Amino acid sequence: MAMAKKSVSSFTLIFILVLVIFEVPEIKAQDSECLKEYGGDVGFPFCAPRIFPTICYTRCRENKGAKGGRCIWGEGTNVKCLCDYCNDSPFDQILRGGI
């Protein structure tokens, strides 16, 4: 009888662990993994023209294989073009602050 209880307990424990492992949702990538700087001093020319989508967005897609691009504005003309490898939304492109 004791052996049967031990087998059932072991089976139950293994079954629960398998369920937990397969039901854990995938962890989404952090911004640091998604956003990479385009490179060079291209921020202001890529982000300043008031066109839609920005040159940053278009060039990141064409030249870097990213899903899109975002502009991060600092003080004055301090701008960075970041290629976004996780999100392809052209509507969320311009971020203020954070440089």
UniProtKB/Swiss-Prot annotation:
It is found in: Secreted. The keyword Secreted applies. GO terms for cellular component: extracellular region. GO terms for biological process: defense response to fungus; killing of cells of another organism. Residues 94-99 form a propeptide. InterPro entries: Scorpion_toxin-like (IPR003614), Scorpion_toxin-like_sf (IPR036574), Scorpion_toxinL/defensin (IPR002061). Gene3D superfamilies: Knottin, scorpion toxin-like. SUPFAM superfamilies: Scorpion toxin-like. The record marks 50-51 as: Reactive bond. Disulfide bonds join 34-86, 47-71, 56-81, 60-83. Residues 1-30 form the signal peptide. Keywords: Antimicrobial, Disulfide bond, Fungicide, Secreted, Signal. GO terms for molecular function: sodium channel inhibitor activity. Inhibits bovine beta-trypsin and alpha-chymotrypsin on a 1:1 molar basis. Belongs to the DEFL family. Protease inhibitor I18 (RTI/MTI-2) subfamily. This is Defensin-like protein 2. It comes from Sinapis alba. The lineage of its organism: Eukaryota, Viridiplantae, Streptophyta, Embryophyta, Tracheophyta.
